[in-house]
């Protein structure tokens, strides 16, 4: 069954394994999430739990939000997400979900919003090769063919300059190096998408090795 928790990316550091290997890790702070709602097949057409993370001030919440979280006897939340494929019997409305649902060595998928890079060219955005930089080439960092005379148009799917980043990205099969239940921290091997302090979702791996 799927397990999951919402957290905030703190940054990267490194730890040593027992054999002395240096492991780069991303620190994720996952303060206790609260189960706000259980969705059932009878009422909603599918099964899922809705969890909330990070309290926000009462005056910033509207009336429907306040009424929704009142059923779970908790404060309004900044971030609310649904998790599907979970063991519905293991959760109740108002229950706290903590980092100790995971264990050391477990494989997870981490989803976040990538850093926005603004308007970028085809080389940086799509990883294309540049043209020769020598004198007289007249083709250095351009996107490439825009369609010859016969089609008289640019083909669909042509990789062009545009806004880069700011998209939802999921990195799969990352190993949890350490679970610090006292400080609500997860240390995940490698890097995860997003800037510091950005929201990330940690879930059981879909394609675990």
From Swiss-Prot:
Region annotation (Disordered) maps to 118-152
GO molecular function, one example? rRNA binding
- What cellular-component terms does GO give this entry? cytosolic large ribosomal subunit
PROSITE patterns given for it? RIBOSOMAL_L3
In Gene Ontology terms, what is a biological process of this protein? translation
> Subunit composition?
Part of the 50S ribosomal subunit. Forms a cluster with proteins L14 and L19.
Record family assignment: Belongs to the universal ribosomal protein uL3 family.
Record function comment: One of the primary rRNA binding proteins, it binds directly near the 3'-end of the 23S rRNA, where it nucleates assembly of the 50S subunit.
> Which protein, by its recorded name, is this?
Large ribosomal subunit protein uL3
State the organism named in the record: Bacillus licheniformis (strain ATCC 14580 / DSM 13 / JCM 2505 / CCUG 7422 / NBRC 12200 / NCIMB 9375 / NCTC 10341 / NRRL NRS-1264 / Gibson 46)
